[in-house]
Amino acid sequence: MEALALAQGKPPTAANIRSVAEAVSPEDAAWAFTQWELRERARAKFPDAERMLFTREALEQATPAAIARYHASMFPHGALVADLTAGIGGDLMALAERGPVVAFESDEERAVYAEWNAGLPARRDDAMAAEWQWEYAFCDPSRRRAGRRLSEPEDFSPNPVEVARRMSGLRLGGIKLSPMLSDAFLRNLGDSIEFVSHRGECVEALIWIGTEAKPGRYAVQIAAGGAVSRLDASQTLPARRDAAAFVFDADPSAVRAHALGALCAEHGLHPLADSVGYLTGEQAAASPWLRGYRVLADAPARERAVREAARRLAARVAEVKSRVPDTQRFGWVARVVEGERRVTAVLYPRERSVRVLLAEPLDAGR
């Protein structure tokens, strides 16, 4: 770790790298400067990133600390949990906070880093080839190979279909996957599916399997501080309608989980025309699941019509939100300036046409 100490706080210039290399070795110097670069990038995921070790690829897939704590919270306190894919230890650290863990990581470098980061031993063998002597397990199949993101689940390591089959005999097993995978594929793995959002993005799909899994489909929102909110996706959507006094952009996990019916029922909202993810209603609604806007104008997506609406408001478009395909063809919307009042342009589909709302965020000025 001498190289890390020597490289700390120094920009990775040729002179600095050469200076550190003279004290250790060129390989150790390059490794140390890479670690400090990765530690800086990892700060968004891990509060204690400055003490951790990373590989570039493993950091990309590593679970942020707030989400890892949610994963760990699903397992009983004090029960043994197997981390089948420890990586550099993102989930392993959170699992260890709540009880005993057995960790598997077949990649030697990642296993060493996981041990450093979590302070626990990691078995170097393949978890899928081991005899399972636990009732709880978590798996985050690798979705990258040689720096390339894999899109086909059968290429993941381990194969999530095989993991789900093995987990069916447990009390509870969790599999972390991409939220971009199809509903049909996810349903084939298990009956309890969660779509998780963090910092405004839907970041993962979680499949829970076993006798303690709660069947259903859910949206889960994890705040930066770790607070957790859940929506049940069992409620149906009400009838669609045109724009009312307010429009709301729903959290992406609620959209992906098909859980907008719960938000409509709670706040008296309706889907906006033919959009997926925009809701509308006559009253303002306060919810961590919704970002609200006061509708000022509703115009067809033609430049003359939108500019005329903006002129009546003496407004300029400061932000563009869109849930229509091929948004780039409406690039002119961002250049609409007909005054100083800052508004948000919301593009949405209605039947075969596209319309533009000019609206003000309800949280503007806070």
Which residues fall in each region the model found?
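SAM-dependent transferase fold signal centered on methyltransferase-like domains
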Residues: 1-366
